Structure formats: structure tokens, C-alpha cells
């Protein structure tokens, strides 16, 4: 049994305003990595950050980060360090700001397991007028196989910023409230990758699904992008159409 899901999906829109972003995926084989600062849910990436340790441990943590401080002499840096240790509120504010800075600098690409979910089509694919990309992770061993399932919990993750900052960032990226569990989300998390592109193997994109409300213009734009892809000799991508089921609240998928 494979350790990876057979397929992962990304919902999106396709119109004149974002055709270049769709071209990035279909033609250039690149995924846009968003910053958590751009997420629509302010609770997404919320965390309970702790910074507990001995004075010597906290002093060592501050000392290790003083290389990024410019314009101060070694003596001034030492004074600043000791003043911060003597002021817990100031130290806490610095730790939280550092955590948020690293968090917002991380790049995130989101996927789901379900290409037929009515809410996903409504919320992320222009009210069923958009598209959904299908990826096969085993064809992208250096990228999409790194997608990790999100954990759903009522509690924020606890981040030990003193001893395990990277683990804390990762846990924060992969924790959401259970109200979002219907998304069955997986995420790729790239430190310092916010608002940049992540290349993937062209063979990893296998299918594209048109929403049940996708217009003829949307389908024409998609066909044009697929022609650009074909001109680069990339593997062919199948196109499907989502259709409203005649007597049940669900969509069916069929080839176009």
C-alpha cells in the first residue's frame, strides 16, 4: 500500500484576471506558495507560543540571533540582551514577533483529497464556475509527496519556541479547527518560501476538472493553455466536466 494518496486536488478559478496563475500550473509546472498572512481565516496558524527555560538558555537564544542586529556595538548588544532578560513582557513580545515573522515567511500550498465536494467547489472554484487540478503525488517525488495532512483540533498547537522552533512552525501550519475538517486538507510547507513558486514535475498534473457552471469561455481558455502545454511536449492532461446529479446533492465527473 502506498504511503501517499493516489491523487491530490487544488480548486481554483480561471478567468481573465488570473489566467497567468493558471498558466503557471498547466504550462510552467509551478505552484504558487502563499503566505499565512494572506489566509482568509485569522485562526489559521494561530498557536500558543511558549518560551520557558533557564536564564542561561534564554540568554543563549538571544545571543544566537544578535548577528541580525546592525548598528550596535558588542557592548550595546550585551546591554540590550540583559535588559530584555530583565523585562519578561519585552522578551515575550520579541519572541511572538519572531515567531510571526518566520510563520509569515513560510510558503504554503494547499490540497484536498476530494474532487466532488460541493462546498469546495462553491468556496474555492468560483461557485462551481472554476476548475480543479488533479495531481498524482508519486509522479512528483520531490514536491507533492511532501504534502502532509492537516490535523483538526479544538486547541491551538503548543509551540516551544526555545527548543523546537521549526517543529513548532510545522505543527502550526498543520493544525486547524474541526469546522474545516470537511476540506480533508493536506499542505506543503516551505520555510522562507512565501509568495514564491515551487516547481513540480510536469507529469504530476494528470487531470483538470471543469466545474458544472464553467462557461464555454472558461473551457476555451483551458484548451488554449493545454495547447501551450502540448507545445512544450509535456505529458497530456485529461479534461473532465463536473455535472449536477439529476436526483441527488452531488456532482458526477465525465470526460468532455
Model-identified regions with their sequence ranges:
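Partner-binding and oligomerization surfaces adjacent to conserved cores of proteins
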Residues: 1-256
Amino acid at each position: 500500500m502506498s504511503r501517499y494518496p493516489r491523487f491530490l486536488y487544488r480548486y481554483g478559478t480561471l478567468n481573465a484576471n488570473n489566467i497567468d496563475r493558471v498558466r503557471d500550473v498547466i504550462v510552467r509546472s509551478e505552484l504558487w506558495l502563499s503566505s499565512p498572512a494572506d489566509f482568509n481565516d485569522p485562526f489559521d496558524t494561530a498557536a500558543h507560543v511558549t518560551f520557558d527555560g533557564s536564564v542561561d538558555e534564554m540568554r543563549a537564544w538571544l545571543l544566537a540571533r544578535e548577528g541580525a542586529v546592525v548598528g550596535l556595538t558588542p557592548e550595546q548588544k550585551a546591554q540590550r540582551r540583559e535588559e530584555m532578560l530583565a523585562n519578561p513582557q519585552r522578551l515575550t513580545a520579541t519572541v511572538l514577533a519572531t515567531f510571526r515573522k518566520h510563520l509569515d515567511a513560510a510558503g504554503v500550498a494547499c490540497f484536498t483529497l476530494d474532487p466532488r465536494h460541493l462546498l469546495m467547489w462553491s468556496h474555492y472554484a468560483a461557485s462551481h464556475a472554476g476548475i480543479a487540478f488533479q495531481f498524482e503525488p508519486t509522479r512528483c517525488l520531490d514536491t507533492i509527496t511532501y504534502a502532509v495532512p492537516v490535523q483538526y483540533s479544538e486547541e491551538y498547537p503548543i509551540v516551544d519556541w526555545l527548543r523546537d522552533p521549526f517543529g513548532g512552525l510545522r505543527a502550526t501550519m498543520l493544525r486547524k479547527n474541526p469546522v474545516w475538517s470537511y476540506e480533508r486538507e493536506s499542505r506543503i510547507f516551505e520555510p522562507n518560501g512565501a509568495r514564491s513558486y515551487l516547481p513540480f514535475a510536469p507529469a504530476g498534473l494528470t487531470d483538470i476538472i471543469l466545474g458544472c457552471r464553467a462557461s464555454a469561455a472558461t473551457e476555451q481558455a483551458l484548451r488554449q493553455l493545454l495547447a501551450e502545454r502540448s507545445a512544450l511536449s509535456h505529458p497530456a492532461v485529461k479534461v473532465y466536466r463536473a455535472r449536477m446529479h439529476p436526483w441527488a446533492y452531488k456532482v458526477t465527473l465525465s470526460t468532455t
